[in-house]
């Protein structure tokens, strides 16, 4: 039978069984190696309250702690929420991650490769 993906959509190679995790969107049980995982990193304090907190703080330089939340989706919810996209047959073979979109302070897109060339 034909195979759609080289890894069968999993990261299990050689293991017989992996534990299940729950999708954060629909609570579906998904094998841990198949779930689409993303980290959400943000400040514990919302942006509006950061200045108030720094003014009230005794310390001059206080690093506000961050919250690290691991988001785990099932395949259908990840596609629906556009965390991952459906790719063509040729596109599925590309294993390198897509280039990250970066913005400068003005809100304009920045190409890191072009900046590296101009810096030299």
Curated annotation (Swiss-Prot):
Biological processes, Gene Ontology terms: cytoplasmic translation; ribosome biogenesis
Region (Disordered): 88-108
Keyword Cytoplasm: yes
GO molecular function, one term: mRNA binding
GO-annotated cellular components: cytosol; cytosolic small ribosomal subunit
Keywords: Cytoplasm, Ribonucleoprotein, Ribosomal protein
Domain of life: Eukaryota
Compartments, record wording: Cytoplasm
PROSITE patterns the record matches: RIBOSOMAL_S26E
Subunit structure: Component of the small ribosomal subunit (SSU). Mature yeast ribosomes consist of a small (40S) and a large (60S) subunit. The 40S small subunit contains 1 molecule of ribosomal RNA (18S rRNA) and at least 33 different proteins. The large 60S subunit contains 3 rRNA molecules (25S, 5.8S and 5S rRNA) and at least 46 different proteins. eS26 interacts with eS1 forming part of the mRNA exit tunnel. eS26 interacts with TSR2.
Protein family per UniProt: Belongs to the eukaryotic ribosomal protein eS26 family.
Note: There are 2 genes for eS26 in S.pombe.
Role this protein plays: Component of the ribosome, a large ribonucleoprotein complex responsible for the synthesis of proteins in the cell. The small ribosomal subunit (SSU) binds messenger RNAs (mRNAs) and translates the encoded message by selecting cognate aminoacyl-transfer RNA (tRNA) molecules. The large subunit (LSU) contains the ribosomal catalytic site termed the peptidyl transferase center (PTC), which catalyzes the formation of peptide bonds, thereby polymerizing the amino acids delivered by tRNAs into a polypeptide chain.
Annotated protein name in UniProt: Small ribosomal subunit protein eS26A
